[in-house]
Amino acid sequence: MEPRVGNKYRLGRKIGSGSFGEIYLGTHIQTNEEVAIKLENVKTKHPQLLYESKLYRILQGGTGVPNIKWFGVEGDYNTLVMDLLGPSLEDLFNFCSRKLSLKSVLMLADQMINRVEYFHSKSFLHRDLKPDNFLMGLGRRANQVHIIDFGLAKKYRDNTTHQHIPYRENKNLTGTARYASMNTHLGIEQSRRDDLESLGYILMYFLKGSLPWQGLKAGTKKQKYERISEKKVSTSIESLCRGYPSEFASYFHYCRSLRFDDKPDYGYLKRIFRDLFIREGFQFDYVFDWTILKYQQSQLTAPPSRGLVSPAVGTSAGLPPGLTSIDRYGGEEEGGRPPMDSSRRRMSGALENSGNLSSRGPMMPSSSLFAQSAGSSRRVTSEELQRCRTGAGLRNSPVVTTPEGKRSSSTRKHYDSAIKGIETLQVSDERFHHH
């Protein structure tokens, strides 16, 4: 008899693994809906899945938070059934030759700040923000950023009184060193400001292709963390952001100006990036760099007799081919955890397939189309972009022919409408069940 979970889901092939368990593809017995099923042995020394399921339950209903279908015990395993999601931003960053355009980064930044703000509104810090922990959705949620992996999350205030946790020092590094805030490296208890600083490092990583403290050599992990810390502390904000719009430096200056228990002005941070987006003349059309690469790739691989292949071909609109087989569960490069948390490893996020991205070889054809660095939507003709948007099921951006004074207002309205549309896209098919 085929293995079943919760008497509702058929357990399929393994699609990923983590330090404390494994992830399988599941199928709803009646509807054939595909889901991700996380399994953790009940005899594991430090169970993690129950803790994570409780956080998912607290966060349920939030935009960009995976829906939990079922949690319980099946035989020897704690079991969590959740939405199947698409590739991580790290996967897509790799697909785009490890550099993203300003337009793509700004479209992502708006959603990512929203995810962090929602997480904080529920009285929790994430404490391990990195590109691997943000996943795009599938199908009609293909352009929606999801936040995952709550294994290191910590409650920072009381739900009722909003009493903030006390300031402490001499804390061990918790999270991933590459994206950890300066205060985290200095041993200061994390608060909301630190999640936002980590997010800033992610954005610069996407723009620059790497961060100055990557690739440092050391004999031990502890020595490596120390070298990363030293390099990060000695790298000024101006140096880090040199050559990029001043808004990114403003973002870091704001984050580092916050006191330990300050509530960040998330609206201000979104606003400086939105104003930059509008000033650059971008359209909020959800045509990301990977959308364009996938479209170009489809033209190279399509038989001559066939018509244009839209970016919607594949598992979801705008997702690149080949990214349905990605293993995000490799080692923890530059990651650090406190001694008490050493067993709290994670199987972050649901994936569609397994397989190591780096071992797959080149994913894009070696064509002159890809000779330029991946990124700018301006490198594709307006006609191609029109086909791209139409094929992906995206509404065309309005053609702005108004005078300069009215253009900003028109673009801002379109921007606000677009982001509101993706942020309110919510479908809850089932209620959370715990057995």
Swiss-Prot record:
Entries under CDD domains matching the protein: STKc_CK1_delta_epsilon (cd14125)
Entry keyword annotation includes Cell division: no
SUPFAM superfamilies: Protein kinase-like (PK-like) (SSF56112)
Binding site for ATP: I15, G16, S17, G18, S19, F20, G21, E22, I23, K38
Subcellular location: Cytoplasm
Active-site feature positions: D128
Enzyme Commission number, as recorded: 2.7.11.1
One GO location term (cellular component): cytoplasm
Span of domain Protein kinase: 9-278
Region span, Disordered: 313-363, 394-414
Modification after translation, per record: Autophosphorylated.
Lineage top rank: taxon: Eukaryota
Reaction(s) catalysed by this chain's protein: L-seryl-[protein] + ATP = O-phospho-L-seryl-[protein] + ADP + H(+); L-threonyl-[protein] + ATP = O-phospho-L-threonyl-[protein] + ADP + H(+)
Coiled coil: none
GO MF annotations in UniProt: ATP binding; protein serine kinase activity; protein serine/threonine kinase activity
Protein role: Casein kinases are operationally defined by their preferential utilization of acidic proteins such as caseins as substrates. It can phosphorylate a large number of proteins.
Family: Belongs to the protein kinase superfamily. CK1 Ser/Thr protein kinase family. Casein kinase I subfamily.
PANTHER family (alphabetical): CASEIN KINASE-RELATED
The protein's name: Casein kinase 1-like protein 12
Source organism (scientific name): Arabidopsis thaliana
